[in-house]
Amino acid sequence: MPMQIMLSTQVADEAWGKNALLSFHQAQATIHVTDYSARNTVQKAARKLRGQGIKDVVLAGENWDLETCWAFYQGFYSAKQDYAVEFPTLDDAPQAELLARIQCGDFVREMINLPAEVITPVELARRAAHFIEEQAEEYGDKSAVSFNIISGEELKAQNYQGIWNVGRGSANPPAMLQLDFNPTGNPDAPVLACLVGKGITFDSGGYSIKPSDNMSTMRTDMGGAALLTGSLGLAIARGLTQRVKLYLCCAENLVSSNAFKLGDIITYSNGVTAEILNTDAEGRLVLADGLIEADKQQPKMIIDCATLTGAAKMAVGNDYHSVLSMDDALVAALFKSAETEQEPFWRLPFAELHRSQISTAFADIANTGTVPVGAGASTATAFLSYFVKNYQQHWLHIDCSATYRKTASDLWAVGATGIGVQTLANLLLNPVKG
């Protein structure tokens, strides 16, 4: 029998402790909040209920709305998906929004949580394309979606040198998804946004190999690709009417006799050469191919997402996504969307000086910072800037360290979070004017 969960602004009886978050009566639990908009309080209560082994619940009573239902679901979710939540009947619009958030958020979490033996580079590209097709079919027209998956040696033949070099050491071939969501029906319609995601389905570090503890969660290094796919899916569910292109740059970074090595120099299709000083700085190498392709489309904005640097995670932990850009108006639009959706983002510095901190005697740029004390997240962004012609405008880089938690918190279970899906969907629907 499922437990009924009530929501109340009344203070719990002191028998449950001072300012108790939860109280119980037979097969009913009550969450005590100061007001009905207290999302974090509801999410914490859901985590506590899960911690007590409760897996089957009904949200009962008249005080539940879209945001409290969503907060409860966020806290109740677990990677094992061994739970059931029955929601109250909401009005049509919030009910549809709740289901869309669950659908898109669960896609992101599942992709990140699944093992690398399941989510190979080609499989990640395939599942992402299939998901966007399903969203387009459910909320509009499946014919709005077209895509191409380039894999293996064909990447080399088409000069996607970053993805091919990073992925050539694995038996699972690297892949690039090129997806076009065009609901206008006009093949010449302008592109609102190009989304470029890092899809490293497992990262050993390559010859700059990671220690075992750091490697244990590296199936999640495709979090940026999953996040952007889920965001586009939610934007479609919310009624996106403008053209958006999605590029996922997918590979496994492994050690083998065929793997790329330190000292190698990659020549990209835009003519930029990059020396490999650290094979564990591979994410920027694959993203470069996607950014070159995105830039060719002349979109109004380019957004890339990647679990790119440990430096960003050291700065903001698992609690925020880091934002780096020289376009203040675009950053402001992102933060407005984040405020609306109540998701955590934090801006880190990116300036011209960082572009001079990745120099090398053997190529145009190096794939790591080459100054004694460098800002790792900033120099990684600087590397990417060499693949966006007008990098000072209309380009936003997100170092998304909040995609996954290795340990639980009072808000989140171990595993993928889905943080950022709503914000980026909101930004696609509310872009910078002009």
Curated annotation (Swiss-Prot):
Q: Where in the cell is it found?
A: Cytoplasm
Q: Which reaction does it catalyse?
A: Release of an N-terminal amino acid, Xaa, from a peptide or arylamide. Xaa is preferably Glu or Asp but may be other amino acids, including Leu, Met, His, Cys and Gln
Which PROSITE patterns does the entry mention? CYTOSOL_AP (PS00631)
Required cofactors, per record? Mn(2+)
Keywords attached to this entry: Aminopeptidase, Cytoplasm, Hydrolase, Manganese, Metal-binding, Protease
> Which domain of life does the UniProt lineage start with?
Bacteria
Q: Note how many cofactor molecules are bound and how.
A: Binds 2 manganese ions per subunit.
Q: Extract the SUPFAM superfamilies matched here.
A: Zn-dependent exopeptidases
The keyword Hydrolase belongs to this UniProt entry's keyword annotation: yes
InterPro entries registered for this protein in UniProt: Leucine_aapep/pepB, M17_PepB-like_N, Pept_M17_PepB, Peptidase_M17_C
Q: Would you kindly state one Gene Ontology biological process term found in this protein's UniProt entry?
A: proteolysis
Instruction: Give me the residues that bind Mn(2+) 2, please.
Output: 198, 203, 221, 282
Q: Which GO terms describe its molecular function?
A: manganese ion binding; metalloaminopeptidase activity
Q: What is its EC number?
A: 3.4.11.23
List ligand-binding residues for Mn(2+) 1: 203, 280, 282
Q: Where is the active site?
A: 210, 284
Gene Ontology CC annotation, any one: cytoplasm
Q: Which CDD domains match?
A: Peptidase_M17 (cd00433)
Q: How does it assemble?
A: Homohexamer.
Under the heading NCBIfam families, the entry gives: PRK05015.1
As for family, the record states: Belongs to the peptidase M17 family.
The task this protein performs is described as: Probably plays an important role in intracellular peptide degradation.
Identification of the protein by name: Peptidase B
Gene, per the UniProt record: pepB
